[in-house]
Amino acid sequence: PRAVTEFNYRISDADQAHVFVGLAITKREEADKIERGFVRHGFATVNLTDDELAKEHVRHMVGGRSPLAADERLFRFVFPERPGALMRFLDAMHPGWNISLFHYRNQGADYGRILVGLQVPAKDDKAFTTFLKTLGYPYVEETNNPVYKLFLKS
């Protein structure tokens, strides 16, 4: 298993997802091996290990407004930095809900700050409230935050 150091996603295409993922490596050759593994499992991959533009700037710009993010609600979560924390979140989600935005960057702390955009049908509001309460991770809804409205909200 490899430590995920960064994970950025914004819905932009109904047919395919473009995800910016950072993985911990100790040797440059490991990046090529990881890339081959992704390709072997059917994932199109662009290796950005040596791409300074990606590492210094574009990693912070993944996303923007998306016409596919209608009825999106935005949340900040605090996840424990331990194996299984994200899987617990994903397993608890209803299959009819959609993650339209996801941003995580490992800061070296014992917890991770996650930003998630979720598309949840209005008919599921009660189930969604239960999901948030039983998940047990601290969260803040940011759907009405001015910076969200300026740069991300469709």
Regions found by a protein language model. Name each.
Residues P1-S154:
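A conserved regulatory-domain signal marking ACT and ACT-like small-molecule sensing domains
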